[in-house]
Amino acid sequence: MQNNDPTYNPLEDIDQIIVTEAAIQARLIELGKEINEAYEERDVAVIAIINGAIIFVADLIRQLNISMKLDCIRIANYRDDDKSIQKPEIIDKIRLDLKGLDVLIIDDILDTGRTLSHVTGIFKTMQPASLKTCVLLDKKTTRSIDFEADFVGFRIPDEFVVGYGLDFAERYRQLPCIGVLRPELQNPPEWS
């Protein structure tokens, strides 16, 4: 909720915390070990899907002790003419040449599967040596496209979540945990 009160705490807008800050930090260490093992002695291009994955990627790559290059891609989701289906569109492209590289795409959440399916489809045409995906959150119950991530931080219920990079109307990304936004705030009046 928009609030110019200096005593406002955005955690007050959270109905329920589903992944604590401590759980995130512990899982980052384990996820880093999994990725290090998978890419041992290989040069990896890590591609972050931003804005949502920016905090996750920043924290995760500090757990990696592999040879890596980092690039970012920005995706926006737009609705078809019938206003029912989101179509991912690349807003900012990567600069790395992926040909012959091992590629790891990192995103904040896998829910419908549309974004990661779209991005991996595009990247496959760039002839990488291998292509894997990593997500902080896997929300299986809403999957509309058959897609599985190779590395998963947490599997979560079908709830609208914010925090640790995930937003609602560009808010709540700064929260150190992941929580469910209070129901009355999920359809607020227009924020300025």
Task: Give, region by region, the residue ranges found by the protein language model.
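PRPP-associated nucleotide enzymes
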Residues: 1-192
